Amino acid sequence: MRTQFRSVLGLLAGTVLCLAPQAVALPSTAPVAITAPREAAPAADPAYKVLVFSRTAGFRHSSIDEGITALRDLGAANNFTVDATEDPQTFTTTNLAEYRAVVFLSTTGDVLDNTQQTAFEQYLGSGGGYVGIHAAADTEYDWPFYEGLAGALFQSHPAIQPATVKIEDRAHDSTAHLGRTWQRTDEWYNYRTNPRSTAHVLASLDESSYSGGTMSGDHPIAWCKNYAGARAFYTGGGHTEESYADTAFRRHLLGGIRWAAGVTQADCRAETGYTSLFDGTNTTGWKQAGPGGFTLADGTLTSQGGLGMLWYNAREFTGDYSLKLDWKAGGDDNSGVFVGFPASDDPWSAVNNGYEIQIDATDTVDRTTGAVYGFQSADIPARDAALNPPGSWNTYEIRVTGERLEIFLNGRKINDFTNTDPVRSLKQGHIGLQNHGDGDQVAFRNIRIKQAGNEPPGPRSGAVRGVNGKCLDIDNAGTADGTKIQIWTCNNSGAQHWTIGTDNTLKALGKCLDISEGANTDGTKVQLWTCNNTGAQKWTAQADGTLRNPQSGKCLDASGSTWNDGTPVHLWTCHTGPNQKWTLP
């Protein structure tokens, strides 16, 4: 928020919206007409290259040629170059390094030999992108790494027929152009496993809308995930030749490619256990405080007027929780998300008794996007790397654990704040969305919450990624006390699978990340050791991306300055250089 309102500049001439009372959260004043939100002209994507691989060792889809043509057309219109091949010899580390993403276009069967598989794994571990289309799930059944990359493998399919696709995530670039449902005709795969527990589901099939679905009503059909250092996107559509002439499906593919290539950002962590607070159909449970309000159209709340706040009065939240929501600003618009405030019809109560997680492109650093407004700036480099530009959707996760407030933008932590003011305690309170003032129009969708009650949050497991995209690794997967800890190309092995405990330990292979002899001098070895609950085994994540050992006051550091496979980690004075930045699961 700001206490000084900006003048309105450059508003698009828009149609007048008719505000139906049941569809709008407004104060008890007469409805007002508003102009359509302005959106900045999108900037051109940076130039990059995409490899399209369509080798088939099994069934060959007649739509492959149409798919290649469509992808070339998308590239020509969106500043990427497509190289299409069926030659597996292309899969060398040198060749693959030219590409921001590799598309498996209805590949089938065993298409890469062991050497080529290794090269592809190395490419992905270095931050490459993968896009799987349709029969990419009918590929490489004997390569476990690939099954993890694709997310799920083909089981069966019924006849080609129309079906209703439910769009679960309308913020991702591959689905943001779609409505809440999408009517399509295609060949609908059933999968051997459900990817929901390991991937972020973007769209799923309504099995009641067609015949032959075998996934018990939970049938993901498009998803994304971060996997072994890579970005992986898969869509089950694309069997038919007609698919590649369908504007909506082509835009779906474009969004998947742009995300896999790192052009756009999204929260692609697996998501389960959330309860909807706003599902796009009505504002039941919400109440407007102060002037202005929100319009409701296309499953989206858009702020207008102000200064006011739409708050969830149906329930006060206590204990630990994770709040997620999607938001979009058209330009330099101002809004925010409030947490931890008492029930009140005065929007200033939230300002004075809670915390606002800011949405605003320009202001002082403690009052711009990702900041705890007026209290703590976001990690600006992390924020800027995670932020989609005006006119695009972004996703916040606001995680409350006791008095700790963590903010994630598109899946990346950008702020870590601890409250010390009893008046603003985060242990109980409501949540709200700010409508800041005339000219500030920010849209919100898909507001959901996952509560842990008063229980501590559970442990989190996965890779710990550091400098040069490499993973924290146990040398040769050894389990002896004193085994070296190093960085290594991410490989999804048990030697790189760490569990962050609620006791601030990092465990792998049944033992703990440990500072040798509990020392505190620069260069002290960090090793694997039997867990013993000492201060030498405690690590806390900082907002700047470092992992700090509270006992020594020093940070986990990849030694030296070249950071290749096998570089050991050690203890060192915190300096926030790239070799001290770690991304936790």
Predicted regions and their residues:
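Helical hinge/lid and interdomain linker segments adjacent to catalytic or ligand-binding clefts
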Residues: L51-R55, F59-D138
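A glycine-rich, often tryptophan-bearing local segment used as a flexible ligand/cofactor-contacting loop or short
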Residues: F104, G109-L178
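Aromatic-rich beta-strand patches that line glycan-recognition/binding surfaces
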Residues: S335-D345, T483-T489, T524-T530, P568-T573
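Extracellular glycan-recognition/adhesion modules and their associated mucin-like linkers
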Residues: E455-T479, G494-T521, G535-W563, K581-P585
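Extracellular ligand-binding/catalytic regions of CAZymes and related secreted enzymes
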Residues: P31-P37, A44-Y48, S62, D73, ...
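Secretory targeting and sorting signals
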Residues: M1-A30
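Carbohydrate-interacting regions of secretory-pathway proteins
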Residues: Q155, R269-E455
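Catalytic beta-strand/loop cores that center a nucleophilic Ser/Cys/Thr
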Residues: A152, S156-G229
